[in-house]
Amino acid sequence: MEIDVIIPLYKPGKELFTLLDKLGSQSVPVHQVILLNTEEKYFEQLIYGIRFLETYQNVKVYHVSKREFDHGGTRRMGVKKSSADVFVMMTQDAMPKDDRLIEKLVEPLQGEVAVAYARQLPREDSTPVESYTREFNYPAKSRIKSAADLDSLGIKTFFCSNVCAMYDRRTYEELGGFVESTLFNEDMIYAGHLVQAG
């Protein structure tokens, strides 16, 4: 099974190298990392003087203008650049806690689950409100959600986060993927379609 990681970028900093290193040392290997970079000049400044493509041989970089960027459309473009069986959507500030991120995300997709998102842990410098929000939205215990949860969870039934989420490609294609044009919540819109489809 091939697994690709797709990451939209905007003015990436040096933490991108740490993220790529962590993705390169996962217990379940990543086939390809697809970077969808907005505004080429910032990326070029970041990698100036280093052998980026030699160091990160499984990384492909595609540049998108700021005018063209759209949360749904840009991610759709990234999926089209991938041929993997499953793919992970991440943001540039998401950082794997350990080398088992991909392993843990792919486990539920072995059954009937079509998308799994990672738990976000609060940063050490988080405010109490930020910490509480992370704990509420990303509890320690995993849960499979379906239409049966609508009465108890309401709109939270559709919660999914492309900060770090793995998708089954076959189901993604069957449902038509992410909406073409959206400023935000492409992940929850997709999850809503998924829950409604059963």
Language-model region placement:
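Short, well-formed alpha-helical segments that are part of the catalytic scaffolds
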Residues: 12-25
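Short aromatic/hydrophobic "clamp" motif used to bind/position activated sugar donors
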Residues: 87
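Conserved donor NDP-sugar-binding/catalytic core segment of glycosyltransferases
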Residues: 99-131
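Conserved nucleotide-sugar donor-binding
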Residues: 83-84, 161-175
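A recurrent flexible, glycine/aromatic-enriched loop bordering the glycosyltransferase active site
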Residues: 148-167, 183
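Acidic donor-binding segment of Leloir-type glycosyltransferases
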Residues: 22-63
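Acidic donor-binding loop at a coil-to-helix junction in glycosyltransferase catalytic cores
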Residues: 184-190
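Glycine-rich, basic loop-to-helix element that forms the pyrophosphate-binding segment
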Residues: 65-82
